[in-house]
């Protein structure tokens, strides 16, 4: 077994800030984290392998980083760099991770939901989100963000139903694309839901944050609201996102007009246009006018459902709620991203933990897994300076080191 320890050498926001990350190579028995502190200076970093993620991995490659964390150059051989300038590490170097799907504002619900009970039972816990003080929520948000930083994450696609996370995000520890989520199964309340979303989106944008209005899921947003979301897309928007095919019941609702979701929606007198106007979950892509969409979960997607959009898998959340995983062979690995989902449906906010599950249930090699964790999420979310070691980018630098123990140590 191979245990890996990772220390972050350069953060994406500030070269003098540090973050940590653990990653995998083949099989794992234990993991640990290392935080690296250093003085700002031009650095020449090398390890057993360098994973630039826009070209093939380079054995004993050298990464030159400026004092603001910007990639200056890549050298394919250590002899190209004066030996006294080299910082040599065991393991591999890769960019910082991108968490393509999270619900940071639900962090205070960690541990409340029983595992494996399905989405409808899980949703009852989410409805308890307001039974907490603002202090409880804000402390949980700050702690969860610190966890992401400690786990080597440099950017996040975050679902927002409230402005609870805005204060923390304004500290700019991480990059965020904020998806202002709408949920409304009653046609007579569509305008209220939509106007609230516009107000919240504008609040985030006024604070300098990327923000777009999005739909929660095909079963929770009727066509009339979906069209409003499509029409709200403006020059500041880059991407939409939606939870899709997360459960068997969702497919049964649209394809067979039966099942637990069907009974639930009828039981709450939801507008019937949700299921009558759609024969498949993926029909909503037409309602969104062909916009660029990040489709999240896809646990029960089939090969014929896959389009040219980006896809995000959250395997630990899928196991937590539905005890099921997607068929990873159906995805284009250039369009596949990974997310943690929320602490309400996960035990950690760790891309490593997600990748361990993907690795065990796919034939993806290490370079592909790293692309899924770094490059693809950055491309999907429009963070052009992240994701690879291309010249001029500021992606963060993560060291992945093989160790025989799990002790936390400071390298510098």
Predicted region positions:
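His/Asp/Glu-enriched, well-ordered alpha-helical/loop segment
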Residues: 263, 287, 326-402
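N-terminal metal-binding scaffold of metallo-dependent hydrolase/deaminase domains
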Residues: 32-80, 379
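Alpha-helical scaffold segments that flank or form the walls of functional sites
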Residues: 64, 92-93, 110-173, 195-206
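Active-site gating loops and adjacent loop-to-helix segments of metal-dependent hydrolytic enzymes
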Residues: 108-139, 177-183, 247-289, 359
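Active-site core of metal-dependent hydrolases
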Residues: 208-328, 334-337, 342-343
């Amino acid at each position: 077994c191979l245990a890996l320890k990772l220390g972050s050498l350069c953060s994406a926001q500030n070269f003098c800030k540090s973050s940590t990350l653990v990653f995998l190579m083949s099989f794992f028995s234990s993991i640990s984290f290392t935080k690296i502190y250093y003085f700002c200076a031009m650095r020449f970093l090398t390890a057993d392998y360098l994973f630039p993620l826009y070209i093939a991995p380079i054995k004993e490659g050298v990464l030159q980083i400026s004092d603001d964390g910007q990639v200056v150059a890549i050298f394919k051989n250590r002899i190209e760099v004066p030996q006294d300038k080299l910082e040599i590490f065991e393991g591999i170097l890769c960019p910082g991770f991108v968490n393509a799907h999270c619900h940071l504002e639900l962090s205070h619900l960690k541990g409340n939901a029983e595992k494996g009970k399905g989405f409808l039972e899980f949703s009852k816990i989410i409805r308890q989100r307001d039974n907490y003080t603002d202090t409880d929520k804000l402390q949980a948000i700050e702690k969860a963000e610190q966890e992401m930083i400690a786990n080597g994450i440099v950017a996040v696609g975050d679902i927002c139903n409230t402005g609870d996370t805005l204060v923390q995000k304004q500290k700019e520890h991480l990059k965020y694309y904020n998806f202002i989520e709408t949920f409304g199964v009653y046609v007579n309340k569509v305008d209220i839901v939509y106007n609230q979303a516009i107000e919240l989106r504008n609040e985030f944008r006024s604070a300098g944050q990327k923000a777009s209005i999005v739909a929660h899921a095909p079963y929770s947003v009727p066509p009339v609201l979906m069209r409003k979301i499509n029409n709200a897309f403006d020059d500041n928007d880059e991407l939409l996102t939606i939870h899709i095919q997360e459960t068997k019941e969702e497919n049964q609702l649209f394809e067979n007009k039966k099942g637990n979701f069907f009974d639930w929606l009828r039981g709450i007198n939801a507008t019937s246009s949700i299921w009558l106007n759609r024969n498949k979950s993926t029909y909503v892509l037409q309602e969104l006018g062909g916009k660029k969409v990040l489709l999240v979960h896809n646990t029960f997607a089939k090969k014929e459902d896959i389009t040219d959009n980006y896809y995000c898998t959250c395997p630990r959340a899928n196991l937590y709620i539905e005890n099921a995983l997607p068929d990873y062979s159906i995805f284009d690995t250039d369009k596949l991203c990974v997310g943690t989902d929320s602490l309400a449906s996960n035990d950690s906010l760790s891309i490593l933990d997600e990748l361990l599950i993907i690795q065990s249930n796919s034939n993806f090699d290490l370079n592909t897994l790293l692309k899924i964790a770094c490059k693809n999420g950055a491309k999907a979310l429009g963070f052009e300076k992240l994701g690879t070691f291309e010249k001029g980018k500021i992606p963060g630098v993560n060291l992945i080191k093989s160790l025989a123990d799990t002790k936390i140590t400071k390298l510098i």
